[in-house]
């Protein structure tokens, strides 16, 4: 199992390391569902980024990630082109979150074992190649805002 710093976390602040949190999430996503640790709210919010991915990359995320062919070098290079071609640079926050969402879906599709596969771990290299420091800052802001909303909903449900 992963010795993740963020898998169990329910909160996230400006002092936390978003790059490590995303890497932990992508690693976790590459595991079979039966091999995943029960995650906290941080990963629950990261899961919501798949909705952003559906809006940016289309409703059939499985078909999209299947065509990434992460099990080949040509497919890996093509993946960068595919993802970049879908980014219109109109809603930077949504598109930044969508890239995380599509990479998580790719990690699931190309992983699914008790430990990450070579193909599923290529999403970490794609993360580095596709997501700028500015994009990472936008993802961090979106995560903090969505966590705040999630926590507010939880408080209202308890009352």
Swiss-Prot record:
Q: Name one Pfam family in it.
A: Poxv_Bcl-2-like
Going by the entry's taxonomy, the superkingdom of the source organism is recorded as Viruses
Q: Would you identify the family this protein belongs to, as annotated?
A: Belongs to the poxviridae B14 protein family.
- Name by which UniProt lists this protein: Protein B14 homolog
Q: Which organism is it from?
A: Sheeppox virus (strain InS-1) (SPPV)
